Regions:
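Juxta-kinase regulatory segment immediately upstream of eukaryotic protein kinase catalytic domains
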Residues: 1-20
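A conserved alpha-helical element in kinase catalytic cores
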Residues: 3, 43-86, 100-115
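Active-site acidic catalytic loop and adjacent metal/ATP-binding pocket
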Residues: 24-43, 163-211
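A short, glycine/Asx- and small/polar-enriched loop/turn
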Residues: 27-28, 36-38, 86-90, 251
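ATP/Mg2+ or Mg2+-diphosphate-binding catalytic cores
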Residues: 46, 138-146, 150, 258-293
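Conserved short submotifs of the Hanks-type protein kinase catalytic core
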Residues: 88-99
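A cross-family kinase active-site recognition segment
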Residues: 100-153, 173-175
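Active-site activation/catalytic loop segments of kinase-like enzymes and analogous catalytic loops
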Residues: 207-240, 251-266, 280
């Protein structure tokens, strides 16, 4: 799905003020801010015709927003009560957040994670397990001939190996609701404080999933050591002490490589980043810098 196709879907929603909508993000989803200071934000997923789980995920994300509001967890709020399906694409509509007053940092993230990790499992709907590796095959197929078939097979092998290893893990923390992609980029700091955004990976699983993300950021994405120390001190525990961390880290690295691969057919920078990531995994070098994409 490129920007042109996403704008076609946006226009087909029939929502007002979509013609000059601002593209905020284009990755797994396309996210648009419609015109006007109070115009809603529209999130468009990839075609779900052959992947009905994408529509189910969008429906669950809207339900989650209402549930988090009931528990007074600061998070994005849906502007419509249910997800739509527009020409096969999941579409959700959200209230626009006030302008950010500053970038989010680890302290903002950890404050929200502590709230999420204290939540019970919802009773009105079910949360899935955090299937870190569930999208690998779909992403590799979208990459097609743009990537080396040997690299695709290598990632499939890693996927299978880490899936098997993850099934044997014993958590240190209680199992329960998690964000699933716990990074400062998924926190918006407005005038009233930090707000959690991008709820589609919310799951019920090991809380360690949410902590491994920052440990990986320290090694792969240039997170300063002081920032990581702030995060662990505020949370009260460093996930690197847990023996299961290398398994969850390896699974996440595998998924991150495959996720970038889906953009390779249309974006040379994505292909370069994919090759960098796969090479570092093949060489077993855990400190090669990866670039956010």
């Amino acid at each position: 799905m490129d920007e042109a196709r996403a704008r076609e879907i946006l226009a087909a929603t029939g929502l007002p003020r979509t013609r000059n909508a601002e593209l905020l993000a284009l990755g797994e989803n396309a996210v648009f801010a419609t015109a006007g200071p109070d115009g809603p934000v529209v999130k468009i997923g990839r075609n779900a015709t052959d992947h009905p789980e994408l529509l189910e995920r969008a429906r669950r994300e809207v339900a989650l927003a209402s549930w988090l509001a009931e528990w007074e967890v600061p998070a994005v709020r849906a502007a419509e009560p249910a997800a739509r399906s527009v020409d096969g694409h999941p579409v959700t509509v959200w209230h626009r957040l006030p302008a950010a007053v500053r970038p989010a940092g680890p302290a903002d993230l950890v404050a929200l994670l502590r709230l999420v990790h204290a939540l019970p499992t919802p009773s009105a709907f079910s949360l899935p397990r955090r299937e870190l590796l569930g999208g690998v095959e779909r992403w590799l197929r979208l990459a097609g001939d743009a990537i080396d078939p040997a690299d695709a097979d290598y990632l499939r092998g890693r996927r299978d190996g880490f899936a098997e290893a993850a099934a044997t893990l014993t958590p240190y923390l209680p199992v329960g609701p998690i964000h699933g992609d716990a990074l400062p980029r998924n926190v918006h700091v407005g005038p009233d404080g930090p707000v959690l955004v991008d709820l589609e990976t919310f799951s019920a699983d090991f809380r360690e999933h949410d902590l491994v993300v920052m440990a990986l950021s320290l090694d792969r994405y240039g997170l300063p050591a002081e920032a990581y120390d702030t995060f662990t001190a505020a949370y009260g525990w460093d996930v690197r002490e847990w023996p299961g961390t290398p398994v969850l880290r390896g699974a996440r690295e595998t998924a991150s490589c495959a996720w970038v691969a889906q953009h390779a057919p249309a974006n040379p920078k994505a292909l370069d980043e994919f090759r960098r990531r796969v090479a570092s995994l093949r060489e077993d070098d855990p400190e090669v810098r990866w670039h956010p994409f």
